[in-house]
């Protein structure tokens, strides 16, 4: 018996079509850098508006980090995204 179908089934449990499976830093439109956040309330709004993510919080470096970002929205560090131009 192959373990592949079982592993695949476990990966897909709970994931509905269109449901995000990743987290990440939203990208600034101006310079492609991570986005600064003064507080979690601002970050949550940034995540909704910039990354179409339902939630987010400020990390330890006051950078906005979003949860459940849709796969079609680029986040910082994705292949093909331009480097941060500070």
Swiss-Prot record:
**Tissue localization of expression:** Expressed by the venom gland.
Name of one Pfam family that matches = Toxin_3
Give me the disulphide-bonded residues.
Answer: 33-84, 37-58, 43-64, 47-66
Residue ranges occupied by any LCN-type CS-alpha/beta domain in the UniProt entry: 22-85
InterPro entries reported in the protein's UniProt record: LCN-type_CS_alpha_beta_dom, Scorpion_toxin-like_sf, Scorpion_toxinL/defensin
Q: Name one GO cellular component term.
A: extracellular region
**Where found in the cell?**
Secreted
Q: Does the keyword Secreted apply?
A: yes
**Signal peptide per UniProt:** 1-20
Q: Which UniProt keywords apply?
A: Disulfide bond, Ion channel impairing toxin, Neurotoxin, Secreted, Signal, Toxin, Voltage-gated sodium channel impairing toxin
Any idea what job this protein has? Answer: Beta toxins bind voltage-independently at site-4 of sodium channels (Nav) and shift the voltage of activation toward more negative potentials thereby affecting sodium channel activation and promoting spontaneous and repetitive firing.
Q: What is known of its domains?
A: Has the structural arrangement of an alpha-helix connected to antiparallel beta-sheets by disulfide bonds (CS-alpha/beta).
Q: What is this protein called?
A: Toxin Tpa5
Q: Which organism is it from?
A: Tityus pachyurus (Colombian scorpion)
């Amino acid at each position: 018996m192959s373990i592949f179908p079982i592993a695949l089934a476990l990966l897909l449990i709970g994931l509905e079509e269109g449901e995000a499976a990743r987290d990440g830093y939203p990208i600034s439109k101006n310079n492609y850098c991570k986005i600064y956040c003064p507080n979690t309330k601002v970050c949550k709004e940034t995540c909704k508006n910039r990354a179409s993510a339902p939630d987010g919080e400020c990390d330890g470096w006051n950078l906005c980090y979003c949860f459940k970002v849709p796969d079609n929205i680029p986040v910082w560090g994705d292949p093909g995204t331009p480097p941060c131009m500070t």
